[in-house]
């Protein structure tokens, strides 16, 4: 669990406001967790005329219990017991692919705890990314390696690099998953940083390893992995420029369905440029992971509210366009888990599993690493059903 500790513990200190963050550590996007927000924000603009209004938010008991029951099932000891990230995409065969970043594999004790990770005296496996496939209400874990020695589906190039997952799409029968590569450059707690963006392509029948990995634009400090949306002949890719406080949305697009096409970037004047350097800050207040979804005739941005310090609030903005402006902040939900050492982060939608409205997930975590051993329920996604009017 060394990487999990080194990544989370320094961020926890910084987010709690106990110390200044070294400039080098924040030079590019860190692990997707909420950050100290801006101290002042301008008044919210009116909601877009074509954007829906949030009507009600309720717990999605089916999905929340699906992952709870699966995580507690000890019928296999090389499968999922908790993770964050929680993106999803519908596979061509109709199955649902759940995409995770940091992942615990192994068993759950009868008291609801998990053994420490391998290397800390236990047998819990810790990977930086994994998949789970849902079919007919049943889940199965996808990893590479073997049952005795699981490895990540998106393998690191060496022990000083690793990948965290972003949103995904399907093109030409293959699953295209965005990943952010991080690197360790020293021995100190702060000595790691974002390095680049890539897209990995997976065959639906062989999800344990990519068939190809291609570099994505990475030259200007934007993590192009926050959200993906197909709309009107384009595939829009949403990124975050994470300065700690604030975080800025950026928007790019590719003609057609594949992220391997030619990218163009939204400029400040609303036109598009082939140069990533022209990419404009669309708005602040987004998290590292968020979503943009078409609902009715408008577009809904779902995000944790990073205009507040360690906010438990999930909010929505609306637009008449997939690239904004997104206005009219609406409260969606206040996460009840947020208290003490526990925080929530990175809410986003799963439109392919929604019925009447949107399904939203969010992640739960703790600033105290041993909490993840003590209580397996902490490090698991929660799901919500949101209806609009």
Feature annotation, model-predicted:
Residues 18-47:
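C-terminal region of N-terminal signal peptides and the immediate post-cleavage residues
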Residues 84-87, 149-169, 224-227, 288-291, ...:
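Beta-propeller and closely related beta-sheet repeat lectin domains
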Residues 223-231, 239-241:
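Long, low-complexity, proline- and polar/charged-enriched segments
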Residues 339-368:
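Short aromatic loop motif centered on NTY/YTY
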Residues 1-29:
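Secretory targeting and sorting signals
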Residues 41-78, 91-161, 170-219, 239-284, ...:
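Beta-rich carbohydrate-recognition and catalytic domains
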């Amino acid at each position: 669990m060394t990487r999990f500790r080194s990544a989370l513990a320094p961020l926890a200190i910084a987010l709690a406001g106990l110390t200044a963050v070294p400039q080098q550590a924040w030079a590019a996007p860190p692990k997707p967790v909420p950050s100290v927000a801006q101290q002042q924000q301008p008044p919210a603009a009116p909601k877009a005329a074509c954007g829906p209004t949030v009507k009600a938010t309720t717990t999605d008991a089916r999905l929340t219990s699906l992952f709870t029951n699966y995580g507690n099932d000890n019928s296999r000891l090389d499968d999922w017991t908790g993770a964050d990230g929680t993106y999803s995409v519908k596979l061509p065969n109709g199955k649902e692919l759940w995409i995770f970043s940091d992942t615990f594999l192994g068993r759950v004790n009868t008291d609801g705890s998990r053994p420490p990770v391998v290397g800390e005296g236990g047998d819990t496996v810790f990977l930086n990314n994994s998949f789970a496939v849902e079919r007919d209400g049943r889940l199965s874990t996808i990893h590479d390696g073997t049952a005795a020695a699981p490895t990540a589906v998106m393998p690191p190039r060496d022990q000083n690099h690793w990948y965290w997952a972003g949103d995904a799409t399907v093109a030409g029968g293959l699953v295209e998953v965005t990943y952010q590569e991080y690197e360790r450059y020293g021995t100190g707690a702060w000595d790691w940083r974002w390095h680049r963006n890539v897209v990995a392509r997976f065959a639906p029948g062989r999800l344990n390893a990519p068939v190809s990995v291609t570099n994505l634009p990475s030259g200007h400090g934007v993590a192009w992995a926050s959200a993906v949306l197909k709309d009107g002949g384009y595939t829009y890719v949403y990124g975050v420029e994470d300065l700690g406080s604030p975080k800025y949305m950026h928007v790019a697009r590719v003609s057609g369905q594949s992220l391997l096409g030619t990218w163009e970037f939204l400029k400040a004047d609303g036109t598009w440029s082939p140069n990533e350097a022209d990419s404009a800050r669309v708005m602040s207040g987004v998290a590292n992971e968020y979503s943009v979804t078409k609902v009715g005739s408008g577009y809904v941005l779902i995000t944790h509210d990073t205009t507040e310090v360690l906010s438990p609030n999930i909010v929505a903005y609306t637009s008449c366009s997939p690239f904004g402006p997104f206005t009219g902040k609406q409260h969606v939900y206040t996460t009840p888990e947020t208290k003490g050492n526990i925080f929530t982060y990175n809410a986003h939608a799963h439109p392919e599993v929604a019925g009447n409205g949107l399904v939203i997930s969010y992640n739960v975590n703790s600033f105290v690493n041993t909490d993840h051993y003590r209580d397996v329920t902490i490090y698991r996604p929660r799901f919500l059903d949101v209806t609009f009017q």
